Amino acid sequence: METDRRAFLRVAGSSLVLGAGSVWTAAAQAQALPVSFPGIPNPLEGGVDVIATGYIWTEGPVWVGGEDGHLLFSDVPGNAIYSWDGKRTTAFLAPSGYQGFPIPASLREAGSNGLALGRGGLLIADSGTRALARVDLATRQRTVFAESYQGKRFNSPNDLVVARNGAVYFTDPPFGLAGVQNSPLRELTFTGVFRVTTDNQVHLVTDKLSPNGIALSPDNRILYATDTSGWVAIDLDASGMPAGQRQFVASDKVGGARGDGMKADSAGNIWTSGRGGIYVFSPKGEHIGFIPIAGRVSNCAFGPDRYLYVTNDTQVVRGRIRAEFPGGSAIRY
């Protein structure tokens, strides 16, 4: 079974060498087969437009501020976070993960991955440092606030989401390490989903998944995670810890697609990347929308004016969500 996040989206026979300094070639992108779901509507008013390009592997988009805000996103192997202000893209934080040079061969992805707003700043799943960190949006100073569980270092934190009470949930696969599951750097024997409290206590939510992306329902009572089986829902109790786990959407229900990053909208729908584009599932797990996007899609984020921003291989694209689509008139960002 392939464990590489990008292998989830790869068609049989494709071959890419991944790691710091590697590039995604146009030929490799062309190997992504087109995907369609007859009868499943496209939630967008039109197609998607490229707003930033020329990166290695984009991830972790998050909108910062209101109507006049900006988009932040990671270039994970490039070890940098970039900002798009509606007109141009500039470097926001480099390095965004591993702080040394040269980057050791033991690290496959040295930079930040998932990004989220919380604790009065920017929170990053730091694949290279193998930790969670807070970045002051004004000074850009980094502060690590979680890096181990029961004395053992995390694998390589991948994605995160912040609860209303300030707790941070995150996934910890080994994708950032050379050798992935076989990396000699691994100290934990499992790939977990964790919860970090506001006083930085780390609690294990589950060690029974091969997790990647993560999202919370609007009421914060359901935690969603991607897995090799598809998408999983974890019911949370009043303390924010698991009360049960169930299959939300099985991979074989959507043509064998497996997810990467995802977001929940204000109606409780889950917008998730997968083979061929963005999939939208209702809170009941019904497949209610699909946005076809060429190349490999890693994650998405909502912004003002109903725009959906998508990290897409070497670039970032965006499209406008139809107001009449379920939840479209009240998308939160």
What are the roles of these predicted feature ranges?
Residues 3, 9, 13, 29-333:
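Sequence-structural signature of mature extracellular/luminal beta-sheet repeat domains
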Residues 13-22:
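Bacterial N-terminal signal peptides
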